[in-house]
């Protein structure tokens, strides 16, 4: 419901805020949902458990000016030294602006660029009013965080350009428990002519004079999520994606931290775009020493026409503040996403250990061999069997990556009676031969793609993305279907509905193996993503009991947009245990480990050629919310350790899904990385400790734990008992007998 600004008088009377003039106000203390947003005239305070975000509207210019984003402040705050209106053009670099427009003397990177009918890009968006909403409205057609009154409060600030009749509504949703402010923007054309949006940031924030470091995630296929940290220098630095999806190259996340900030100490500001398409993230340190940070649409991929009365809504950006280092920032993202982003029923429920057929057999299988693989999997204790690529295609059978995409009917040579008999056979298998539980069945699809060698492409070549008469560039022998077209969306929804109704399918792995080329317009990327989101929204709502996993050649779409619909994502096509330590640690900067798909694969590894002990590979895979095997199960039938490792993965899983992650030692800083998962109530914990290279005459260092109750006693692996204070201030030490050593240690509070 809407709360009118009349509530401000009541808040002032209660002493929650006091107008002090010139853009100053006192900040609410002891924040609850009722005072997460406090307003006094045109002064605004957004309050978290340990965070304050304060800004005001300049009474002369109507511009929104930032006062503070950081640790909680109280009492009156000093007014920023702003130039008089006549000095505006000469001194724009001194002003910390909330939503910087273009063309009026601020030469730093803008948050919005609007081309008017006459051709110019000048905007003058001034404060017009505001409203406060209990709860959080949904974003039309886009993934978004959610919450009820008491969980989240939303401030909407209305800006208006009197000359162009353009309105901008800035949304600030405050989740106090997580020190999170979620921002998005609506731009509406209220004039009579057409306008074009050429740039729109979901978030812009200006920081005062100080040194900052920029932390981000870079990579490529099979080496995603490498942590990058560099000093913010004068000028513009940034990154993004122009691939049509969030990409392996750069993740739509970054953090700003003080140079002295570590994993466990210091201030950190995290920013994560809830979006799966092309994006841009930029940070600029201006001549006056102020630092501006923005993230939103990639302007090179945006030219959005707005006719009279039409609106463009930006994706939202989640920003969190931490006074407990980068690790504290990550834990706030993780808790927020588990509770208020991932809408699946599986967000916090145990995931079944699975076996995926891909690296075990690739395209070489038939009904009989698949049934044998499933039987061998069930005997090991696997609870979900997944048939990957190669099961479909009639006239153009999918026996390699050269044909079949788009023709989503079972290959009659491999499955002469369709999927139902094989699925029935598999789902009648008993797990472990002693359990009453039956094996579940899952299947791989890549609905957004089409092979030219397919019946679908022969019938609808116009459904593939193309730019006029230019040649259509193939990648992995495939093209991209244009999901901006409603008929393509309906085709995918219909065949997926038929597939899921045809047999007892419990799991879908949704893949995407290439980016967008030959886009017909600069706005194709966003139109495409809106179509993808409509398909995701329809299917996940229609089949809520199906466990959906996202994939894009591994982690090419590991983003908060996909997580809104799918509770887990395949983290990387690289299943090498050593490489996965770095990839999974990096991914956890913004995304909860509960969302990571991680599998134990064969050796030598199919991507790196490296041979790593079975136990090490299994322990690394246990750190993902979806543990699985990616190999031929026949190679494991005589290994007694495998069923025990699967049982250990199931024991670990609840803590990985719902616990707080502490990265105790980083793989880029030490050859002995370590991580600890602690139950939210502190009753249990599990330590993962690795050795990444051989060491002669060098003992592994002690590892200090975090997040425990210092006054409580903890039993370590059911043996020795130590206080939380001892474990955190002294720690534990282990020795490793092999080049790639690993330990998984369970702790339980007494």
Curated annotation (Swiss-Prot):
Show the catalytic activity.
Answer: Hydrolysis of terminal, non-reducing alpha-D-galactose residues in alpha-D-galactosides, including galactose oligosaccharides, galactomannans and galactolipids
Q: Where is the signal peptide?
A: 1-26
What EC identifiers does the entry list? 3.2.1.22
Predominant location: secreted
Keywords per UniProt: Carbohydrate metabolism, Glycoprotein, Glycosidase, Hydrolase, Magnesium, NAD, Polysaccharide degradation, Secreted, Signal
- Coiled coil where? none
GO MF terms held by the record: alpha-galactosidase activity
Any idea where this protein resides? Secreted
Supply one GO CC term from the record. extracellular region
GO biological process terms, alphabetically, are: glycosylation; mannan catabolic process
Pfam family of the protein (one)? Melibiase
Q: Does the keyword Repeat apply?
A: no
| Gene3D superfamilies associated with the record | Aldolase class I, alpha-galactosidase from lactobacil brevis, Golgi alpha-mannosidase II
Essential cofactor(s): Mg(2+); NAD(+)
Give the temperature dependence. Answer: Optimum temperature is 52 degrees Celsius.
State which residues carry a glycan (glycosylated).
Answer: 58, 162, 186, 194, 366, 428, 432, 453
The record's listing under InterPro entries reads: Aldolase_TIM (IPR013785), Alpga-gal_N_sf (IPR038417), Alpha-glycosidase_related (IPR050985), Glyco_hydro_36 (IPR002252), Glyco_hydro_36_C (IPR031705), Glyco_hydro_36_N (IPR031704), Glyco_hydro_b (IPR013780), Glycoside_hydrolase_SF (IPR017853)
**Could you say which enzyme class this protein belongs to?**
hydrolase
Where's the active site on this chain? Answer: 511 (nucleophile), 573 (proton donor)
Q: How does activity depend on pH?
A: Optimum pH is 3.5.
Q: Carries keyword NAD?
A: yes
Q: What does this protein do?
A: Hydrolyzes a variety of simple alpha-D-galactoside as well as more complex molecules such as oligosaccharides and polysaccharides. Active on paranitrophenyl-alpha-galactoside, raffinose, locust bean gum and gum guar.
- Complex formation: Homotetramer.
Recorded family membership:
Belongs to the glycosyl hydrolase 36 family.
What name does the UniProt record give this protein? Alpha-galactosidase C
Its source organism is Emericella nidulans (strain FGSC A4 / ATCC 38163 / CBS 112.46 / NRRL 194 / M139)
